[in-house]
């Protein structure tokens, strides 16, 4: 009998589960305390449950994390974990500490099927969607370790391996737990889903979860974005920006969208590109994150110079667009933006296509 992993259950699902066992719904609060606050996963040690309930839980459900294959550290506090789903598939996550916050960057898929040309994950191909349990296991592994070091996770971003909006059900259930005070208790502004532009899912997102939205933009016209972000061939910039406006109008609180823009030398970093970007985002509550390109094996791209990035940023800033340049961290352990690769049994055969 395959046991269900309780990490896949949000609060409502846990209520239904316990009622199905003939228990009162208050058991949900008790077990969430054990799992998410006390980091206790052994039912036999949950002594506010009767022996018969502990035995029943052991028969039908489990609490299983992922196996930590490797944990890398660098001097400025960045940590990268490599986690095994099975012998063929590994995922990666990154913890980035800053003065007033600690951000955990987690994965939503094994590999990625979107093939963005500047991204190491996209070059690996795709194997599978992660389950809610596999997503939440990442956060539990990190929080359990960081708590022992008196560090904290204040922000969670779906910016690791995979396209979150091609795994909606699991990602939204995970967001329920990230926001739930009985689990991780993060605010909606502290959880961010980053998409390359899966427009139908973007239109559904506001109906399902109130978390923040980031868009991997990287170009200011369809011709260039078709090349850099191939999903643009299916959903154009016009469609993408319409979906962004729907998201902004749906919230009861004032929102903005974070647009991510990787800086590629001689590709998308000219003054003309900056001016076109200003025009493109006119009328949208936007914040732009300029990302120096992080190199990986066999890439055709180089990063823009610091002077070019500064000039680009100044153009946006003087046109009233909030703009920041991401500090590159974790590059020496393959943990910088666009470098997460893990280990993927590629079902798309993209790695084969690149070799032949």
Swiss-Prot record:
Matches recorded under CDD domains: Radical_SAM
GO biological process: rRNA base methylation; tRNA methylation
Active site (catalytic residues): 92 (proton acceptor), 337 (s-methylcysteine intermediate)
Cofactor dependence: [4Fe-4S] cluster
Recorded catalytic activity of this chain's protein: adenosine(2503) in 23S rRNA + 2 reduced [2Fe-2S]-[ferredoxin] + 2 S-adenosyl-L-methionine = 2-methyladenosine(2503) in 23S rRNA + 5'-deoxyadenosine + L-methionine + 2 oxidized [2Fe-2S]-[ferredoxin] + S-adenosyl-L-homocysteine; adenosine(37) in tRNA + 2 reduced [2Fe-2S]-[ferredoxin] + 2 S-adenosyl-L-methionine = 2-methyladenosine(37) in tRNA + 5'-deoxyadenosine + L-methionine + 2 oxidized [2Fe-2S]-[ferredoxin] + S-adenosyl-L-homocysteine
Enzyme Commission code: 2.1.1.192
GO cellular component: cytoplasm
Compartments, as annotated in UniProt: Cytoplasm
UniProt entry tagged with the keyword tRNA processing: yes
Main location: cytoplasm
Record key words, sorted: 4Fe-4S, Cytoplasm, Disulfide bond, Iron, Iron-sulfur, Metal-binding, Methyltransferase, rRNA processing, S-adenosyl-L-methionine, Transferase, tRNA processing
Binding site for [4Fe-4S] cluster: 112, 116, 119
GO molecular function: 4 iron, 4 sulfur cluster binding; metal ion binding; rRNA (adenine(2503)-C2-)-methyltransferase activity; rRNA binding; tRNA (adenine(37)-C2)-methyltransferase activity; tRNA binding
Comment on bound cofactor: Binds 1 [4Fe-4S] cluster. The cluster is coordinated with 3 cysteines and an exchangeable S-adenosyl-L-methionine.
Cysteines paired by S-S bonds: 105-337
Binding site for S-adenosyl-L-methionine: 162-163, 194, 216-218, 294
Residues covered by the Radical SAM core domain: 98-327
Top EC group: transferase
Record HAMAP family: RNA_methyltr_RlmN
Family per record: Belongs to the radical SAM superfamily. RlmN family.
Protein's job: Specifically methylates position 2 of adenine 2503 in 23S rRNA and position 2 of adenine 37 in tRNAs. m2A2503 modification seems to play a crucial role in the proofreading step occurring at the peptidyl transferase center and thus would serve to optimize ribosomal fidelity.
Further remarks about this protein from its record: Reaction proceeds by a ping-pong mechanism involving intermediate methylation of a conserved cysteine residue.
Name listed for the protein in its UniProt record: Dual-specificity RNA methyltransferase RlmN
Organism: Ruthia magnifica subsp. Calyptogena magnifica
Source taxonomy: Bacteria, Pseudomonadati, Pseudomonadota, Gammaproteobacteria, Candidatus Pseudothioglobaceae
Gene that encodes it: rlmN
